[in-house]
């Protein structure tokens, strides 16, 4: 039997390392995508923190703020619905006073039916999109450091 507890206002840090360069916050089906992105980036030697934000209202502000501060003030939220009123809003609000940038991956068009892998890809919330977002952040950081 699974004895794991899920407290209201809580979250679970699934992957954490001192070398984490960004934090990915996901909920529901996008947690699987975040885990896959973690595995792909790890093969390239890139560490990301992955948080399952199973409670969105209220959101786990202390965990998110700490993660953001420890991972270069960068958080990527990934949600399988529209951006407004969802995970991205909750994460942005939680870290707003701490100079943490939140990149929000969410469904931005009318949902359709189809295979889940195809839909996750189409809506920009797949593991591939998470990996690309992390890479873009690292690239822009390196350009700033060189200038």
Question: Can you annotate each of these PLM segments?
Answer:
Residues 1-147:
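Thiamine diphosphate
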């Amino acid at each position: 039997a699974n004895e794991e507890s899920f407290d209201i206002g809580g979250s679970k840090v699934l992957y954490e390392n001192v070398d984490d360069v960004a934090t990915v916050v996901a909920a529901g089906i996008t947690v699987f995508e975040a885990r896959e992105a973690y595995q792909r980036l790890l093969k390239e030697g890139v560490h990301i923190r992955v948080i399952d934000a199973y409670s969105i209202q209220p959101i786990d502000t202390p965990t998110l703020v700490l993660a953001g501060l420890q991972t270069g003030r960068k958080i990527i939220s990934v949600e399988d619905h529209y951006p407004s009123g969802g995970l991205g809003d909750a994460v942005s609000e939680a870290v707003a006073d701490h100079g943490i940038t939140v990149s929000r991956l969410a469904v931005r068009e009318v949902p359709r039916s189809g295979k889940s892998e195809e839909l996750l890809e189409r809506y920009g919330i797949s593991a591939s999109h998470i990996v690309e977002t992390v890479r873009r952040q690292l690239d822009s950081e390196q350009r700033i450091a060189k200038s």
